[in-house]
UniProtKB/Swiss-Prot annotation:
Its cofactor is pyridoxal 5'-phosphate. It comes from Shigella flexneri serotype 5b (strain 8401). One of its GO terms (biological process) is D-serine catabolic process. The keyword Nucleus does not apply. CDD domains: D-Ser-dehyd. Coiled coil: none annotated. It is an enzyme of class 4 (lyase). Monomer. SUPFAM superfamilies: Tryptophan synthase beta subunit-like PLP-dependent enzymes. This is D-serine dehydratase.
Length: 442
């Protein structure tokens, strides 16, 4: 971006200056609306989420047999919700900032099959595509026992088709493993940030991995191009896919059920704050949408990004969405949080969700490493750096009197609050890689 343009952008949006300086930044969204007012802009409804829920239930008998690790839950891919009181104390001590309410962790990091939040959206979109093909070919009806998809005739049928996706790692892992199991030929276009072990794991499942020296945006573009030339190839579009988004959104109802099981209340007197790491936006956007449908105006969602990749904060704050990238303002998009190394946000998610998100913040790689170490020490839970992005949220919210006033929170409401950090990945990180992460914390 030339200087004059840059200067006028900063004049209009002074916060951009802090982003350019790679400062840890928090922006509380002044334009949030009620769910009723914001919902029409999403372009999807409660019914769409129910349909996704039903589809995953139809596939449950198949998943229970296809992946032994889902047998115990009857083929439902869901993660644990745990309290992390020792980590809460550690954060309060390290940052000299009390966190009012209770701190919880949602362990999507340990979801079965692929060990990340992408096991929600990625697997769902592959299943939705497989179902569509099988229904159209007359090989399946909605009332069938879907475990029949494991038969050789279905494998044979699906092998005529292929799937392509661009990814920094975790989405590729989910889509690759699921597609290969069903019988699709699958190609994952991996950006330069992708970890070597993720590529190796995919190849071990018979997935074709194409590697790029460039970032996420290039990998997605190349994947899209490769798929266009083949009518039997289906491209899963992380930047714009409504299907992926709906796969994530099912998490809202599931979390509501987990809260009910644990006797946790969410209402006006007991607000829920949720902190979601954000890359291109599909995962956190879909989850936030599902949470809003489940808890209405009593849930407050925040997106967390690396200081080197603040694409969603930049896009929503300036209103330019996918018309601007972090590279345009001189930020390099290089971060240890490989899952969040995205320079240009999803225009669909930004525009759909901007009224329903309470805020956005950035944190440095070092902060993620520090918190990664503390969580391992205090709670014995090991995550990858990206998954710690949400962990900085509670102190930002508790420290901001202006945010609390904007939403009229009383001290008592904050004392009764639940702070939920969404841990997005790390359950499958190899030991030696994890030790390198742990060594970087302070």
């Amino acid at each position: 971006m030339e200087n004059a343009k840059m200067n006028s952008l900063i004049a209009q949006y002074p916060l951009v200056k802090d982003l350019v300086a790679l400062k840890e930044t928090t922006w509380f969204n002044p334009s949030t609306t009620s769910l009723a007012e914001g919902l029409p802009y999403v372009g999807l409804t409660e019914q769409d989420v129910q349909d996704a829920h039903a589809r995953l239930s139809r596939f449950a008998p198949y998943l229970a047999k296809a992946f032994a690790e889902t047998a115990a839950t009857g083929g439902i891919i869901e993660s644990e919700l745990v309290a992390i009181p020792a980590m809460q104390k550690r954060l309060e001590k390290e940052y000299q900032q009390p966190i009012s309410g209770q701190l919880l962790l949602k362990k999507d990091s340990h979801l079965p099959i692929s060990g990340s939040i992408k096991a929600r959206g990625g697997i769902y979109e592959v299943l939705a595509h497989a179902e569509k093909l099988a229904l159209e070919a007359g090989l399946l009806t909605l009332d069938d026992d879907y475990s029949k998809l494991l038969s050789p005739e279905f494998k044979q049928f699906f092998s005529q088709y292929s799937i392509a996706v661009g990814s920094t790692g975790n989405l590729g892992l989910s889509i690759g493993i699921m597609s290969a199991r069903i019988g699709f030929k699958v190609t994952v276009h991996m950006s330069a940030d992708a970890r070597a072990w993720k590529k190796a794991k995919l190849r071990s499942h018979g997935v074709t991995v194409v590697e790029y020296e460039q970032d996420y945006g290039v990998a997605v573009e190349e994947g899209r191009k490769a798929a266009q030339s083949d009518p039997n190839c289906f491209f899963i579009d992380d930047e714009n896919s409504r299907t992926l988004f709906l796969g994530y959104s099912v998490a809202g109802q599931r979390l509501k059920a987990q809260f009910a099981q644990q006797g946790r209340i969410v209402d006006a007197d007991n607000p829920l704050f949720v902190y979601l790491p954000c890359g291109v936006g599909g995962g956190p956007g879909g989850v936030a949408f599902g949470l809003k449908l489940a808890f209405g105006d009593h849930v407050h969602c925040f997106f967390a990004e690396p200081t080197h990749s603040p694409c969603m904060l930049l896009g929503v704050h300036t209103g330019l969405h996918d018309q601007i990238s972090v590279q345009d303002i001189g930020i390099d998009n290089l971060t240890a949080a490989d899952g969040l190394a995205v320079g240009r946000a999803s225009g669909f998610v930004g525009r759909a969700m901007e009224r329903l998100l309470d805020g956005f913040y950035t944190l440095s790689d070092q902060t993620m490493y520090d918190m990664l170490g503390w969580l391992a020490q205090e709670e014995g839970i090991r995550l990858e750096p990206s998954a710690l992005a949400g962990m900085a949220g509670p102190q930002r919210v508790c420290a901001s009197v202006s945010y609390q006033q904007m939403h009229g929170f009383s001290a008592e409401q904050l004392r009764n609050a639940t702070h939920l950090v969404w841990a997005t990945g790390g359950g499958m990180v190899p030991e030696e890689e994890m030790n390198q992460y742990l060594a970087k914390g302070r």
